[in-house]
Amino acid sequence: MRVIAIVLDSVGIGEMPDSSEYGDQGSNTLVNTARAVGKLNLPNLAKMGLGNLDTIEGVPSMPAKGAYGVMLEKSPGKDSTTGHWELAGIILKKPFDLFPNGFPENLIKEFEKRTGRRVIGNKPASGTEIIKELGLEHEQTGALIVYTSADSVFQIAAKEEIVPVEELYRCCEIARDLLDEFGFKVGRVIARPFTGNYPDYVRTPRRHDYSLEPEDEMLLDVLVQSDIPVYGVGKIYDLYAGRGITESYKTDSNIDGIQKTIKLIMEKQHTCFIYTNLVDYDMKYGHRNDPHGYAKALEEFDFNLPEIWKNMKEDDFLFITADHGCDPTTPSTDHSRERVPILVCGSKVRKNVYLGIRESFADFGQTIADLFGVRKLNNGTSFKSLLLH
């Protein structure tokens, strides 16, 4: 038996009951994207029941080839780390620390001391905008561009020709250690290398995330302890700080992630968990408020879905979900606090089963643990009994 789980990063399906506390009322990544572009052409996701969850222009409601529902986020927050941790069974009591006014001066001073480089920026900003704003000064002085966002992130941007990527990575490791020493609960430190000339800088694919170690036992730990290999595709390794990952496969685009997932399905014929994150929706289109790019990326995934189905075996399960929203049609360029779809199919899965509104993303992880027959996670309610005949 194998479980293949694909997280469509930021593909939310409507506001959470508490969205207004996050300034996200009215957000609905899928519905609003479809409306903005006229319609979405997602015939295969429609077959999995996506159109039964909301009125998505172009995606009809129809009897599903498996099970479908939505999941609510129990943890406070709306970032990838919080979302993925909850998918794996960790519900945060307190949100990660945010820095709407930049990082404290004493932290930055110590960071400068340990890296031997000055810091410029130190404020919330769009990554593409801040390199345009401070890129020249960075080139002239070698200072590191440090910035944050509405998420719990400490980001360091540097031009590859000014600060070699290996040094940038070392600076990120210093930042990770420092934040932990200072007692700040920051989800991720992110290396943001770029290249090119002012004002047309471009970020290179050598981004690297340094995640906070998951604060509790979670799905991947339990699987690996039970000798079930976990194959992480995309940024899965980074989001769990490498915990519970047997092998990791980096990707440079959604299509690369899809192809690597299909290759694993074809090659790894033993019992295993294949866990993929496709980040382009979020990184390339959601944050940049580009509904047309977002729609195209969804359609590209949909087009490749039959290839995944074709390579699944009798006792395989496919789960498709998301980790938060990032509505490209709202004025905000940040993530949105949204519900997420949960779609499941496989030969053993009952047809056209409505899973309802699940109280937590952790139901996803608990169900997968239940299917593998490993010990229960600390959070979540399994819906295995709804899936199987």
From Swiss-Prot:
GO terms for molecular function: magnesium ion binding; manganese ion binding; phosphopentomutase activity. The keyword DNA-binding does not apply. This is Phosphopentomutase. Its cofactor is Mn(2+). Isomerase that catalyzes the conversion of deoxy-ribose 1-phosphate (dRib-1-P) and ribose 1-phosphate (Rib-1-P) to deoxy-ribose 5-phosphate (dRib-5-P) and ribose 5-phosphate (Rib-5-P), respectively. Binds 2 manganese ions. It catalyses: 2-deoxy-alpha-D-ribose 1-phosphate = 2-deoxy-D-ribose 5-phosphate; alpha-D-ribose 1-phosphate = D-ribose 5-phosphate. GO terms for biological process: 2-deoxyribose 1-phosphate catabolic process; 5-phosphoribose 1-diphosphate biosynthetic process; metabolic compound salvage; nucleotide metabolic process. Keywords: Cytoplasm, Isomerase, Manganese, Metal-binding. It comes from the Bacteria. Its EC number is 5.4.2.7. It is an enzyme of class 5 (isomerase).
